[in-house]
Amino acid sequence: MDFKEILYNVDNGVATLTLNRPEVSNGFNIPICEEILKAIDIAKKDDTVQILLINANGKVFSVGGDLVEMQRAVDADDVQSLVRIAELVNKISFALKRLPKPVVMSTDGAVAGAAANIAVAADFCIASDKTRFIQAFVNVGLAPDAGGLFLLTRAIGITRATQLAMTGEALNAEKALEYGIVYKVCEPEKLEKITDRVITRLKRGSVNSYKAIKEMVWQSSFAGWQEYEDLELELQKSLAFTNDFKEGVRAYTEKRRPKFTGK
């Protein structure tokens, strides 16, 4: 399959999915989300694939939602496309947790919004020491999507997850390592080498064991995902109709602080 928003290739048992919209800091729109889901499905069905690696082209891993497209949707009162993106990014996190193969993510620069939560959905996140994980939703009048709070509360605890979501503070790579979100931290120039080292180690393991482990983890911790997804989409849809969301997007594109009114 030919992709336009991502790159996908398989080499020696490793499927590499590369976000390839560096001109917009790898922002998520509907096409890239659909391509990511398709690539995950291809990797799932391909018996030659042992491991899925996700990385990105450009200086930024991903800013999360494409704010330029969000501005267009706000101006056109096109709430449905915004809801569709929220639905798709949740499905991406779900697909990664349900993929019966190890998922390795290699990050550098900003990992914001939905991208930050998709990173939590990975089994191994290797981050350069320049990486920043940002729950940016509150800055534009939204709440976390991509299964964010479902994943974060389980990964780092309820209090820390709530604080990150409510403040939108950037979490640096070392702190993310301390919290357990990140597996390894290294200098940017060593990121590829360290990622390869982790993948090499994983390739020595049994694919049958990995499949069983991921199913056990799912059943023990994530079986309530569907109910959470319904709630997440319902609340995100209600927030997308608010004046605060419109103000948040406009403030971002105009490079100023938003003035929220609670309406």
Curated annotation (Swiss-Prot):
Keywords: Fatty acid metabolism, Isomerase, Lipid metabolism. Pathway: Lipid metabolism; fatty acid biosynthesis. Its EC number is 5.3.3.14. SUPFAM superfamilies: ClpP/crotonase. GO terms for biological process: fatty acid biosynthetic process. Coiled coil: none annotated. Disruption phenotype: Mutants do not produce monounsaturated fatty acids, exhibit reduced glycolytic capability and altered glucose-PTS activity, and are extremely sensitive to low pH. It catalyses: (2E)-decenoyl-[ACP] = (3Z)-decenoyl-[ACP]. GO terms for molecular function: trans-2-decenoyl-acyl-carrier-protein isomerase activity. NCBIfam families: PRK07260.1. Catalyzes the isomerization of trans-2-decenoyl-ACP to cis-3-decenoyl-ACP. Required for survival at low pH. Homotetramer. Belongs to the enoyl-CoA hydratase/isomerase family. This is Trans-2-decenoyl-[acyl-carrier-protein] isomerase. The gene is fabM.
